[in-house]
Amino acid sequence: MDMTLESCRRFVEVLASDAPAPGGGGAAALVGAIGTALGNMVGSLTVGKKKYTDVQDEIIALKAKCDDLQKQLLDQVEADDKGFVPLAKAYGIPKDDPNRDKILEEATVTACAVPMHIMELCCEALDCVAVFAAKGSRLAVSDAGCAAVCCKAALQAASLNVFINTKSLKNREVAEDMNRHANVMLNKYCSVADEIFNEVKAGFGQ
């Protein structure tokens, strides 16, 4: 079942159940899509306004990018579900099966791919949100701050879905390479998100 075609209420109900999916990865993707859409909204409220004529072309281009990022992030909700299936099946293989370790290793690497991609998409989204916050409509600057917070949460949530899988990999070289890539994104873009949030908050005298 493609949960992105369900209502928000239904998604949350299934998320709260004992169903194997959606889980943290799917939730991260959805939160990332929401954060991206919030940034995109700031762009929508900026385009066409005389006060922001000088940045129209830049904002329009960023909106087009966010349209694509939103779609990709929503696609990752279902992709995360499908990526988990082989891993769940692998854990069900009898421990005395000589092929179990190999199958489990491959499934674990596959399970890392989607949350890693979610992280990458959230980083791209935060680059856009930073511009929306700096150059977009001042009437929607709080929404730009909310967008940054959502994208940061999605980034961090997705990272945990990477780390829980890399921890169990036998091939430590592959695991550490993934961990390194994830941590680089976390270190850079959590700071980007915090800077956006703090600047928006400071603008309200807080």
Give the residues covered by each predicted segment.
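Short, hydrophobic/aliphatic alpha-helical segments
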Residues: 3-21
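Conserved phosphate/anionic-ligand binding catalytic regions in large, soluble enzymes, centered on
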Residues: 17-40, 140-158
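Amphipathic alpha-helix face/heptad-repeat signature
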Residues: 30-34, 62, 69-76, 107, ...
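Transmembrane signal-anchor/signal-peptide helices with a preference for the extracytoplasmic
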Residues: 41-53
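A structural-propensity feature for long, helix-poor, extended segments
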Residues: 50-89, 185
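Long, charge-rich low-complexity segments
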Residues: 79-91, 193-206
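Amphipathic alpha-helical interface segments
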Residues: 80-149, 153, 165
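Preference for long, well-ordered alpha-helical segments
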Residues: 118, 125-128, 140-199, 206
